[in-house]
Amino acid sequence: MAMSRVASTAARAITSPSSLVFTRELQASPGPKKIVGVFYKANEYAEMNPNFLGCAENALGIREWLESKGHQYIVTPDKEGPDCELEKHIPDLHVLISTPFHPAYVTAERIKKAKNLQLLLTAGIGSDHVDLKAAAAAGLTVAEVTGSNTVSVAEDELMRILILVRNFLPGHHQVINGEWNVAAIAHRAYDLEGKTVGTVGAGRIGRLLLQRLKPFNCNLLYHDRLKMDSELENQIGAKFEEDLDKMLSKCDIVVINTPLTEKTKGMFDKERIAKLKKGVLIVNNARGAIMDTQAVVDACNSGHIAGYSGDVWYPQPAPKDHPWRYMPNQAMTPHISGTTIDAQLRYAAGTKDMLDRYFKGEDFPAENYIVKDGELAPQYR
């Protein structure tokens, strides 16, 4: 079965002092499953668009399908604290579905409590809300809908770059406030053409962003663990930079497109930010925890970072007193870039497809696996 591990692993578990994985295999059986989905509550907005599938009310549009097959589908937005609704279902759920936009943090402690849990699905891209090492050790499968919102995020990143470069937000605020002061905007508004833009990470989203930046005649750089083939580099017009800090020192604009891992958590700390050009613009739609929160605030206050934009925070939802809400020259939003209606349709369909394969004992598309057979996907190692 796609969700089970290889027989040799099960044999090792029999003789192991801790047979958590083997026990889970014994409990896994055909029949109805308890599936829990954690999504944000949309309230009055839930009924405004029939394709608004990513909210708790519409629950990916799969309730009728799941229940027609005899499965139980519990949906809740309540995910934090020992008395939350999610916690009540942890002991006996088989599948947990979450999104990056309202993540259910699956800790090692929760994994230990979830004796029936077999599958963790991310409706979207990015499964860092799961303790992946604990999931691997427990024999769980973790998968996401790879590619479902790459276009959405890349388009959003381009928008944020332009908002920062053109100093758009202060002008917009002037209109709202009944003001008119061209000089207050123009003194720090620039063209994108001719600027050096570097992406930290050039996977699916990073490459799409570089492709969309090419017509702007920028100097395009990228840093990644893997170099693109020469033909693709030439098509995009981007140059590979093996040394991250050397690339960063050249950039007028830095875009973060790397997953959150143990290696990238806090990657942009005070020391690294100090190596950036004074007046650099940063766009981060990857993960908030890649940045040192206070270091970003300090650099924005000093002017070393001239503008910071993104839709990712740590934690999420961001508390009302999160310092990024109040730092100067920021163009922050809630986590929205990857949850356009088009993206919701794609990741809802992808989630349904994986559930269907899971029920049938079939493998998922290989690129969707984040944890399989006790192994993490390369980008998370």
Curated annotation (Swiss-Prot):
Q: What is its main location?
A: mitochondrion
* Reactions catalysed according to its record: formate + NAD(+) = CO2 + NADH
What SUPFAM superfamilies does the record point to?
Formate/glycerate dehydrogenase catalytic domain-like, NAD(P)-binding Rossmann-fold domains
* Top EC group: oxidoreductase
Give binding positions for substrate.
I125, N149
UniProt xrefs under Gene3D superfamilies:
NAD(P)-binding Rossmann-like Domain (3.40.50.720)
Pfam families named among the record's database cross-references: 2-Hacid_dh, 2-Hacid_dh_C
Q: In which tissues is it expressed?
A: Found at high levels in developing tubers, at intermediate level in stems, veins, stolons, and stamens, and at low level in leaves and roots.
Compartment annotation:
Mitochondrion
Signal peptide positions are none
Q: Where is this site: Important for catalytic activity?
A: R287, H335
Keyword ATP-binding in record: no
Q: What does this protein do?
A: Catalyzes the NAD(+)-dependent oxidation of formate to carbon dioxide. Involved in the cell stress response. Involved in formate-dependent oxygen uptake coupled to ATP synthesis.
Kindly give the HAMAP family that the UniProt entry links to this protein: Formate_dehydrogenase (MF_03210)
UniProt protein name: Formate dehydrogenase, mitochondrial
Q: Which organism is it from?
A: Solanum tuberosum
Q: Which gene encodes it?
A: FDH1
